UniProtKB/Swiss-Prot annotation:
Record's subcellular location: Cytoplasm
Record protein name field: Leucine aminopeptidase
Main location group: cytoplasm
Binding sites annotated in the UniProt record for a peptide: K390, D395, K402, D415, D475
Protein source organism: Plasmodium vivax (strain Salvador I)
Chain segments carrying region L13 loop: 400-417
SUPFAM superfamilies: Macro domain-like, Zn-dependent exopeptidases
Length: 621
């Protein structure tokens, strides 16, 4: 019996999924769109107040016109034994789908205090001051307490309850300083003698809120939400916050609130009381209402990417990942093309194909396309963009095995984070549907394994642009797959090429776990990415491509080596290598090796989805 087989008797292959999930009983392929497909909440209103129907309920899928064509693009996942997984379980329905959100002007309407949880977001008081304001959102009740440095924290807002307003006036801030990420909870009776939960969440000093601080605030708030189990929650913003940061706050609040339990044997989600109503009380509310829909879309895109990254490699392999991309394309009406090994051979993608030779799973090249409507006077106004994500579903290092301490081989399922970010962006763009932009979502997906067929150190391989590469290290595989993907992208005739990849561990030492690094050959393009970084609140830092180091990639026998012979700046060297496969197109490379994974929480961040989406939208009209 051959070791590698595709059993015809397995009933849970990708296109024959049972109606019930193996873990939760959530309907899979044959159920209604309402529970299967990502969508905007039916009650979600736009800035104009017009209710929007669920996105997918109003769409027709013309790119993949029928089930037969859909099946044709997908591939049966190879198995060694019949119990091997054949699909990536993805939760397309989350508690956020059922969450009704309202944004209310705190200066015009006080927060009700009849039931549920009321949370005050508070800045710490200024140091060395006897009194201070927290944001000036207006109101009648006042409260003071000891802040940092002996100063006072003051609440300016009121609620629709005299008893609670009196409680707020009394202070009750002992041991609460407003320090970032801290909280204090109360359980008190209101005028109707019903008990109401109150909480303070510290946001740190005023005017210092950034992406990093908002993450901590959201995490502290989520802890309160899970502990309280209230279905109705009101959040009173006693802080000033920019619109983009407000949106990011919601995105991260949603992301932290949803728990990934796909691989648990019991369905714990049914035992949880999820919130159903969320009221956001903030000054100048009209300016923030338009951010709600966008926050939902960005959350879904990020959570979708995170699910792919978190899926272990026996579930997420090149075939199952490409199948997931096909399904996504159908759902958001994208054109879809999956290139198999034969087609890749015809394109002479020798660098990419070499990396996957040791795996039981064949290479799969994902190409999804979004074509926005042309609304301008000239067709030339339509920007064409290629986004490339590194898609190594597991990186053992190959014959240069990740065996050294700190090599984190157990985490190498995350080496397809770039691909996940691109697919998450594809969801967002397919949902928002911007005009005057065409986007190609690309990923050269494979697995870097050790076997008798694996490529070896010292091999000389030929990329699709004809350049020969000496393999100095099989663990520098990502740049080989990206090389052929860059050549493919440039042939599409796009205006910009942006690749995103967990490429070099050196990013952990240069920028740590908070900032991604961006390299490129075009200052204007990099500035666009930096601008998108600010509006998406996904931090990126511009790093140089130092041409002086190019000679360290020289090979005695080939055109170049895939690693440097002398230079230790491996992130810069990797960028120099990629640059060899770009001719004239403006190109940027984003290295997310340090920021993709949340090491403390032991889960992915989904980094890059918002950044890439903002980048695309900034070029759309």
């Amino acid at each position: 019996m051959p070791l590698l087989r595709s059993s015809q008797h397995i009933k849970n292959t990708y296109w024959n999924i049972p109606k019930k999930s193996f873990r939760t009983g959530v309907p899979q392929f044959a159920e209604s769109k309402k529970t299967r497909i990502l969508h905007l909440h039916p009650l979600c209103k736009s800035a104009s107040g017009v209710e929007s129907p669920p996105f997918f309920d109003s769409q027709t899928f013309s790119s993949i016109s029928n089930r037969k064509e859909f099946r044709k693009m997908a591939t049966t996942v190879p198995q060694v034994v019949s119990l091997d997984p054949t699909t990536i379980p993805i939760d397309y329905h989350t508690p956020i789908d059922d969450l009704s959100i309202e944004v209310k002007d705190i200066s015009a309407e006080a927060c009700p205090a009849d039931e549920g949880l009321i949370v005050f977001l508070l800045n710490s008081a200024p140091k060395h001051s006897s009194s201070g304001g927290s944001g000036g959102n207006g109101g009648s009740a006042g409260s003071s307490g000891n802040g940092e440095g002996g100063a006072q924290i003051k609440i300016n807002s009121s609620v629709k309850d005299n008893t609670i307003n009196e409680f707020l006036k009394e202070g009750n801030m002992e041991n609460f300083t407003g320090k970032l990420g801290t909280s204090k909870s109360f359980y008190i009776a209101n005028d109707q003698k019903k008990y109401v939960s109150l909480a303070y969440v510290g946001c740190g000093p005023a005017n210092e809120e950034t992406e990093l601080e908002i993450r901590k605030v959201a995490y502290a708030l989520v802890t309160l939400l899970h502990d309280s189990k209230h279905k109705k929650v009101s959040i009173i913003f006693e802080i000033k916050i920019e619109e983009a940061l407000f949106r990011f706050f919601l995105e991260h609040l949603f992301y932290e609130y949803v728990t990934d339990e796909r691989f648990k044997s019991a369905d714990k989600s049914t035992e949880t009381d999820f919130i159903k109503n969320l009221s956001l009380h903030i000054a100048n509310a009209d300016a923030y209402k338009g951010q709600i829909d966008k926050a939902r879309v960005y959350f879904y895109g990020t959570y979708y990417a995170a699910q792919l990254i978190a899926a272990p490699s026996n579930y997420c392999n090149p075939v199952s990942l490409s199948n997931a991309a096909v399904e996504l394309a159908q759902k958001v009406n994208l054109e879809c093309k999956i290139l198999d090994v034969k087609e890749l051979e015809e394109l002479k993608m020798g660098a990419y194909l070499s990396v996957g030779k040791g795996s039981m799973y064949p290479n799969k090249f994902i190409h999804l396309t979004y074509k926005g409507a042309q609304t301008g006077a000239s067709q030339n106004e339509k920007k064409k963009i290629a986004l490339i994500g590194k898609g190594i579903t597991f990186d053992s290092g190959g014959y240069n095995l990740k065996a050294a301490p700190g090599s984190m081989i157990d985490l190498m399922k995350f080496d397809m984070s770039g691909c996940a970010a691109v697919l998450g962006c594809a969801y967002c763009i397919g949902t928002i549907k911007p005009d005057n932009v065409e986007v190609h979502f690309l990923s050269a997906v494979c697995e870097n394994m050790v076997s008798k067929n694996s490529y070896r150190p010292g091999d000389i391989i030929t990329a699709s642009n004809g350049k020969t590469i000496e393999v100095g290290n099989t663990d520098a595989e990502g740049r080989l797959t990206l090389a052929d993907a860059l050549v493919y992208a440039e042939k599409l005739g796009v205006d910009y090429i942006v690749d995103i990849a967990t490429l070099t561990g050196a990013m952990l030492y240069s920028l740590g776990t908070s900032y991604a690094g961006v390299f490129g050959n075009n200052d204007q393009l990099i500035n666009k990415i930096l601008s998108s970084s600010k509006t998406s609140n996904e931090p990126v830092w511009w790093l140089p491509i130092i041409n002086e180091y190019r000679s360290s990639l020289n090979s005695k026998y080939a055109d170049l080596n895939n690693i440097s012979s002398s230079v230790k700046a491996s992130s810069v060297v990797a960028s120099l290598f990629l640059k060899e496969f770009i001719e004239n197109t403006p190109w940027a490379h984003i290295d997310i090796a340090g920021v993709s994974w949340n090491f403390k929480a032991r889960k992915p961040k989904g980094f890059g989805v918002r950044l890439l989406t903002e980048f695309v939208l900034n070029d759309a009209v």
